[in-house]
């Protein structure tokens, strides 16, 4: 079963909160985080905080385990191959998905699409562009296929593959790809305060 959580990052992380969330990351992810810009760091921390909360509820884990990447760049838990996950972050929001089969999730703020991508997709209006883009991105994340391959070739759904549009926050588009349809009761939407409140990591 696929479970998707989304958070509206409607507040700025304090230094204490950012440090506590950083401490929850696997060591290899902390190294990558250090090389990113502050705004990108905040988006990543919200996304991984969301993943941690979801893993705690669905798997009973207290921390995010060590991660690795496939040759195509898809992240996975080498010590827990039965648990599949995906995260996504954009300006003002993040999403995480956990499932018992390969899964991909994407969330995007709806805005004017980049010109080169609008030309590539043939979609110039913001809503149609991003409603399509999150589907392509979710499918690419599920398989580890590059997003440009997905956009250029737009392959049909593979046998057993399902891609579901998810009602996100106003001004955002989201989708999840997996082995089954994501039902409304499998989706949870949180505020930043909600998420931080369910993570007891401030000791």
What annotation goes with each model-predicted range?
Residues 1-203:
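Core catalytic alpha/beta fold that binds nucleotide/phospho-ligands
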